[in-house]
Swiss-Prot record:
Transmembrane segments: none
InterPro entries given in the database record: Transposase_mutator
Keywords carried by this UniProt record: DNA recombination, DNA-binding, Transposable element, Transposition
UniProt cross-references to PANTHER family, sorted A to Z: MUTATOR FAMILY TRANSPOSASE, TRANSPOSASE FOR INSERTION SEQUENCE ELEMENT IS1081
UniProt-recorded name of the protein: Probable transposase for insertion sequence element
GO BP annotation list: DNA transposition
A Pfam family of this chain: Transposase_mut
Organism name: Corynebacterium diphtheriae
Disulfide bonds: none
Disulfide bond is among the record's keywords: no
Domain of life: Bacteria
Free-text function comment from the UniProt entry: Required for the transposition of the insertion element.
GO molecular-function term, one example from the UniProt record: DNA binding
Stated family: Belongs to the transposase mutator family.
Length: 343
């Protein structure tokens, strides 16, 4: 760096007192959020910028977002979400000298405007009553006072935790997961007719019609061939039946989870590239960056279609629920007193 008597020289490329380029840090974080591993980024910097940077340095740079992750994870939430979805993603994390499978649970809340927000991420070795009690308490402590429906995949201990935290909320088994579980043991060539037959169950206008459709499937050739598919629905029947009380538009919000499924698909793709994570914090950091990256792309696409500027509010915001206006009106009819409290 040149020296001058008055000390007025200010470098443009590397400001005084800094050791790294902030633009380079941003690029490394962007590559990491895009799904590249630390070794991939090291190779990329070496080949494109002829820069030799150690994996530890790259990891330290990406750790700079941990404070943002904690702020996001502890942020205040809306007091009411008409619908909350809970879904899980399996990740491999090192535990000493072995690699274990852990579940990363994601809560997605649909607000009064139909916008889907990721409320939080939690990594756990196994689910249970105490775990779900802590998750519900976390959401409640951050401001969530009520939800009409909590939609999940028959998670153990969750109904009890929801009833203790939000006594008026209804726990609903996720229809998408039920369909997937019913098709798990079905051969590929039979999946289409089995799915078509089971569609008569979850699109039935009443509980009696749905039960008759399931009985008819059980008595059919396909039902006798795949009794496990019938058992899946029988076992989940008590948690499935409340779904039938809603009109079609509200039902579509509950079983149309395309945006959540597509988000999970992209997260699975990125986690497969990494193989395994050194610890829970690294997994949480990586998933948060991936979600930000994915939702930023979606927001840019929506803004381009609407020909308007992107509004950055510091939150991870997803797509709008399909047919929401009709659905929220139907939910308002189903829960008139509670709905009026949050207008």
């Amino acid at each position: 760096m040149p020296r001058d008597r008055a000390g007025t020289f200010t470098p443009r490329m590397l400001p005084k007192g800094t050791r790294r380029l902030t633009e380079l840090d941003d690029m490394i974080i962007s590559l990491y959020a895009g799904g590249m591993t630390v070794r991939d980024i090291q190779h990329h910097l070496a080949t494109t910028l002829s820069m030799d940077m150690s994996p530890d340095t790259i990891s330290t740079i990406t750790d700079a977002v941990l404070e943002e992750v904690m702020i996001w994870q502890n942020r205040q939430l809306d007091e009411f979400y008409p619908v909350i979805f809970l879904d899980a993603l399996r990740v491999k994390i090192r535990d000493g000298h072995r690699v274990v499978n852990k579940s990363c649970y994601m809560a997605v809340g649909v607000d009064m405007d139909g916008i889907k927000h990721i409320l939080g991420l939690w990594i756990a070795d196994n689910e249970g009553a105490s775990f779900w009690a802590s998750v519900c308490a976390d959401l409640a402590n951050r401001g969530v006072q009520d939800a009409f429906i909590v939609c999940c995949d028959g998670l153990k201990g969750l109904p009890e935790a929801v009833e203790a935290t939000w006594p008026n909320s209804m726990v609903q088994t996720c229809i998408v997961h039920l369909i997937r579980a019913a098709n798990r043991w079905v051969s590929y060539q039979d999946r289409k007719p089995v799915s078509s037959a089971l569609r008569e169950v979850y699109t039935a206008p009443t509980e009696d019609t749905a039960r008759a459709a399931l009985d008819a499937f059980e008595a059919s050739e396909l039902g006798r061939k795949y009794p496990q598919s019938v058992k899946v629905w029988r076992d989940a029947w008590d948690r499935f039946v409340p779904f039938l009380q809603f009109p079609p538009a509200a039902r579509r919000v509950l079983y149309t989870t395309n945006s959540i499924e597509s988000l999970n698909a992209e997260l699975r793709k990125a986690t497969r590239n990494r193989g395994q994570f050194p610890n829970d914090t690294a997994a949480l950091k990586t998933l948060w960056l991936m979600i930000c990256n994915i939702e930023d792309k979606r927001a840019a696409q929506r803004a381009k279609k609407a020909k308007r500027a992107i509004e950055c509010n510091g939150y991870i915001e997803g797509a709008k629920a399909t047919g929401w206006k009709q659905a929220i009106n139907q939910l308002a009819v189903a829960y008139p007193d509670r709905f009026a409290d949050y207008l």
